[in-house]
Amino acid sequence: MFVRIGFVVAASIAAVTVKRLNVKPSKPSKPSDNGEGGDKEQSVDPDYNLNDKNLQEEEEEEEEEVKLINSVINQTRGSFSDYLDDDILPEFEDLLSGEIEYPLPDDDNNLEKAEKERKYEVEMAYNDGELERLKQLVKELEEREVKLEGELLEYYGLKEQESDIVELQRQLKIKTVEIDMLNITINSLQAERKKLQEELSQNGIVRKELEVARNKIKELQRQIQLDANQTKGQLLLLKQHVSSLQMKEEEAMNKDTEVERKLKAVQDLEVQVMELKRKNRELQHEKRELSIKLDSAEARIATLSNMTESDKVAKVREEVNNLKHNNEDLLKQVEGLQMNRFSEVEELVYLRWVNACLRYELRNYQTPAGKISARDLSKNLSPKSQAKAKRLMLEYAGSERGQGDTDLESNYSQPSSPGSDDFDNASMDSSTSRFSSFSKKPGLIQKLKKWGKSKDDSSVQSSPSRSFYGGSPGRLSSSMNKQRGPLESLMIRNAGESVAITTFGQVDQESPGTPETPNLPRIRTQQQASSPGEGLNSVAASFHVMSKSVDNVLDEKYPAYKDRHKLAVEREKHIKHKADQARAERFGGNVALPPKLAQLKEKRVVVPSVITATGDQSNESNESNEGKASENAATVTKMKLVDIEKRPPRVPRPPPRSAGGGKSTNLPSARPPLPGGGPPPPPPPPGGGPPPPPGGGPPPPPPPPGALGRGAGGGNKVHRAPELVEFYQSLMKRESKKEGAPSLISSGTGNSSAARNNMIGEIENRSTFLLAVKADVETQGDFVQSLATEVRASSFTDIEDLLAFVSWLDEELSFLVDERAVLKHFDWPEGKADALREAAFEYQDLMKLEKQVTSFVDDPNLSCEPALKKMYKLLEKVEQSVYALLRTRDMAISRYKEFGIPVDWLSDTGVVGKIKLSSVQLAKKYMKRVAYELDSVSGSDKDPNREFLLLQGVRFAFRVHQFAGGFDAESMKAFEELRSRAKTESGDNNNNNNNNSNEEESVN
């Protein structure tokens, strides 16, 4: 706007100036003479120059004004061209529409002058009108200029006011902020004021309570003073009462001492009376025995007086012959015992040598190439093994000499020679057993009392049946204190079964209250004597004590293999027990035992009475029985072998043969029997192979219960599912409580002491069974040897052939009275037979388990919780069985390969792989049941029952995933369905939470 105004003003001024320039040269006077005209023209030139200067100055001033206006209003310069085209240029063209004429020289001055005059007049008339019009226009422009200047001044004032307004707004904002701060301080001060008012009110209440409490304290102090005064009086009374009671107590003490003295005297009298009664009863018993013996002696005298001399000689000869036969039998038995003793001592020394060598090799010895080691001796035996073992022990001892071995385990490997004193004791017992009852000088009554029993006692003492636990108390205590090495404990692991079949005796270590051993009166034997050299066979007793004292030696000796050895031993015991039970269930009712063995099934044991030399039975009264019960002794009659019916030898059936020739009989698995001079082979450790080589360090731990192999179940059916692991971890983060993993191993502990008690009870009170076992040993030797040959020569490539062979072997061995009691008297391959049975029963158990998991059907009629528990228990059973197998699989494979047993079923591609695949199907059924229950359960998504059910399903799936090593396609589909339900629930929960938060924000 201002630019237009300024430009119009400048244009108008310029137009006026140009007009003046055009008018002034055309104003000369009328034409006259040349002189006048020239003078006039000369007179006009100075004025014209002055006007030009004035016009230039005015134009410069106007230009300065225009520049000033343009500099002030430079903001609207962009619209200048539009304004020039629209408004100014037309006016400027109107002003300049007339042509400007300039005087030009001409020859015809007159004509030109006339024409100029005429034109001048016309122009003057036109210029006058135009001048008037321009004057009016100038006036209008001046008025317009004044108006625009006023507007410009007003604009400048408004612009100054705008800056003032901005400043005022800024100050207003500052003031509002200050007002807000003041309001906040006012509110805080008001809140503090309210708090102070509340505190003042509370302080007033507290002051009132304080005053009340002070008043109560004053009252209580007054009461305390009153009570103190009263208690002082009561204390004085109590002191007087106590002093009187003390006086009475002293008097009572004096009376008590007198009463005690009297009671002691009465007790002494009672003891004396009881002693006299006991002596009187003993005298009565002795009198009765003497009368009985006197009657028997008189009867013998009468019979002898009636007999002729020839009859007496014949009877004496008969007795001499009987005694000779008995003596010969005893000598043979003693020789057999001595030979057994020699072989046992030789075996013990050899095993101790091997033990020392093995300890040295395991600790710090590397066997050079081409040189024999003790481990080789334990595997490959020959008649020269004893000499080699002795040479190795001397070599190791020489290498360790001077090193100052302070190993604590060396105490276990020191060879103790238990032979010399035991041999002396045995020979002394065998030679002086009949006269040991007369070794002391008792009184007359005791001699008379023992006279009738000397013959029976001597027969009992000299009988080989007393050889079990025949050591003296000192010997037993020393054997209890000694700790044996691990190889000795392995040698005597079946020590409870290594007793001679004709022995029975007394066990002092066993508790009398066990159900296997009836609480019967003890048998009076040679062991009750006090002489130090008693007992024919102290080896059995020492071995029995050793078997009790070395239970934990393996743990102390080889701690590195302690856990694996325990697991192997427990599994072996468990499988043996199952095999015995299965064999008893299958063949127990078909075995025809001799009539005498029918007594074994009866719990009642009849103790026969004493038979005298003439065959008369002693009849004692109840009074004598009560007297004998205090002594806890009884006598046992001698049973004869001819009373047991011997069965004819059994002809074994041929073993089953596989169609593909899986069993071969020409393998070198059967070792030839060693000569009598060579040491017996050391037994393998129970449940496993030999210890690892010394150079290789401890064996690698069993592989963790890991993933199923790629080849298991055919192809890549099972693969890892990281989605399941992530989902399980996310759920477990939300779960605050963590459940403990169930234990994976349920190891059954074999009660060896119960078995030992049962065996001892058989030995002590059921000798008929032992005689029947001896009859089988004598008659079924060829039968057992043929079975042993078949077992040694057996080798299999198919596990089904092994099952058939084990079934045949159990059926054949069921013919024997007692398998182990008979087989221990022969060269029976116990290790291989046990391995065959162990593999067969383990395979059958795994197949039953796999069938149980595969055939499991989820009953829809069953409620949710029992159905899920049923599947969970089945999974726990599967895990326990598989993990227990995996922990001992390496040792079992090496052992089975040694005996020619197939091991492919133990790998992950065998039965174990099938079980893992079946567990994946079980997980699918579990997840489907959980999904079905989630759909059927009514309630909100935040219901804890739904969350717990979902978490339970994911936990089960994760557990099976880790156990089987992955999921198949169907199980993954079931898992995705379960996870989709969880995601929908979590999405709904998130939407609800967002809606709730939006509502809270809108309320706020």
Swiss-Prot record:
Residues modified as Phosphoserine: S399
Protein's organism: Arabidopsis thaliana
Name of the protein in its database record: Protein CHUP1, chloroplastic
Organism lineage: Eukaryota, Viridiplantae, Streptophyta, Embryophyta, Tracheophyta
Region (Required for chloroplast localization): 1-25
Keywords assigned: Chloroplast, Coiled coil, Membrane, Phosphoprotein, Plastid, Plastid outer membrane, Repeat
Compositionally biased residues, Pro residues: 670-706
Tissue: Expressed in cauline leaves, rosette leaves, stems and flowers, but not in roots.
Disruption phenotype: Defective in chloroplast photorelocation movement, leading to damage of the photosynthetic apparatus and subsequent bleaching of leaf color and necrosis under high light conditions. Chloroplasts gathered at the bottom of cells, regardless of the light conditions.
